[in-house]
Amino acid sequence: EYIEDGTITRIESSGVRGKIGEAISQGKLKGLAIMRSHGGRVRAIESGETQIDIAFIGTPTCDEYGNCRGIGGKSDCGVLSYAMADAYHADKVVAITDTLVQFPNFPAHISMTKVDYVVVVDEIGNPQKIATGAAKPTTDMRKLMMADYCTQFVVNSPYFKDGFSYQTGVGGASIASTISLAKIMKERNIRMRFGVGGLTKPMCDLLINDQVDVLLDTQDFDLAAVESVKNLRHFRISAGEYANPFNKGAVVNKLDFVILAALEVDVNFNCNVVVGSDGMLTGAQGGHPDTAAGAKCAIVIAPLLQGRIPAICTDVTT
């Protein structure tokens, strides 16, 4: 509605879905729609290329001075990593919470020094709906088989050794591959040095079972990951620390493995994660390009067909 009436004329995001994606794809947006990776977005903000006039940041808890945390309230999301760049560089910052707590709300994920206003509302969201769609573990036999193939590739590569590092996407097969990998790690007595995420329960289970030294977290995709934030070896990192290609050190460049999903993969190994075969914007690239560029071994899990549409093709849609 706001795109069609001209209220919104430009969009910068890591991806869009649903009616917004349809509106952009149909040419209803008057200006540009720029799709950036997680690292690309924070680079644009920190470099000044993207100027934010005002940032509205949903935070599960906040004190009256503006110290924000992703836990401790009724709508916990875990960490606030992707909002940190906005808070640090926007001209004005508004923290929106449904749980106002006593000062000081420490350790703060976003500091009071960056927040101009605190607004209290009845509800900022429903944490029960955090794990939906792609972020749910799969029970599909085909995807479980794909996950097993992926795991076999990982464990037979030269990078699978004590102290390796690892990240998966949130596709069902990617999540399942972590479960099967954990079993082989236990059998071979191999320990992971660090796991990176977007995190889900299987990765957090590695921490609980003492199969990984530390987790580095930018986003939590289920309630188990949200709860895991309380673990002293579960560290939050900013989007800049995670994947900004222009800073002096990004975590993605220290990855051994990254397991990703895709809408399409072509015969030249190009991947499309944003646009459907019908030309509609229907997904988000997130950290896909960042991790694929940084990791020693990037693995993309995709079926031959997505429904009735070929996922393996001569040329990707985009």
How does the language model describe each region?
Residues 1-318:
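Conserved alpha/beta enzyme-core scaffold
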